[in-house]
Amino acid sequence: MVLAAIFFGGTPILATAMAYPLAICAACVITSIIGTFFVKLGTNNSIMGALYKGLIVTGALSILGLGAATSFTIGWGSIGTVGGIEVRGGNLFVCGLIGLVVTALIVVITEYYTGTNKRPVNSIAQASVTGHGTNVIQGLAVSLESTALPAIVIVGGIIATYQLAGLFGTAIAVTAMLGLAGMIVALDAFGPVTDNAGGIAEMSHLSP
């Protein structure tokens, strides 16, 4: 909203440009609420799978909500220029999509580097066999490696959105990312709970 006031101040589009981020957030909040109803256990009884199902549904519905917010606020045509770059409603919609894609990629990367059946965690476990020193070294190496892909994804998203609609496009992408915060926080909160519960059940030799 602040950037909208800076870039479009004194123009007829000011009010709608300031309302656009609010419309995106409102749409994503509604889609997050709807997504919670899809968090149900499947035939494999995977709790994390149920949470990811809700996240996928929320993301898919957020695309529709983003399109609706764009259509009913600023439209799909040109709304002005930002830093010499023409800003169009369609470009802002694409910026929002990029924000959602960046969020999805970060979730996938996080799952890869923290999953117990993936190479990074298994390599740390294997290094533990030879002692504490190799465990610490391998853990540090994996932790440093794990920051590379998210950084590349975020930088790529920033460059793409800036080329499409300047700083305002980057702000819209960030707004779309924050629109999924409800489901992301739910994953962060319940993920460790399910992992710990699974570990306790395994050490107790309980049936699946």
Curated annotation (Swiss-Prot):
Coarsely, its chief localization is: membrane
Q: Does the keyword Transmembrane apply?
A: yes
Q: Which cofactor does it need?
A: Mg(2+)
Q: Does the keyword Transmembrane apply?
A: yes
Q: Which domain of life is it from?
A: Bacteria
Annotated Pfam families: H_PPase (PF03030)
Keywords, alphabetical = Cell inner membrane, Cell membrane, Hydrogen ion transport, Ion transport, Magnesium, Membrane, Translocase, Transmembrane, Transmembrane helix, Transport
TM annotation in the entry: 19-39, 54-74, 89-109, 140-160, 167-187
Q: Which reaction does it catalyse?
A: diphosphate + H2O + H(+)(in) = 2 phosphate + 2 H(+)(out)
Which compartments does it reside in? Cell inner membrane
EC nos: 7.1.3.1
What membrane topology does this protein have?
Multi-pass membrane protein
Subunit info here reads: Homodimer.
- Protein name as annotated: Pyrophosphate-energized proton pump 2
Q: Which organism is it from?
A: Mycoplana dimorpha
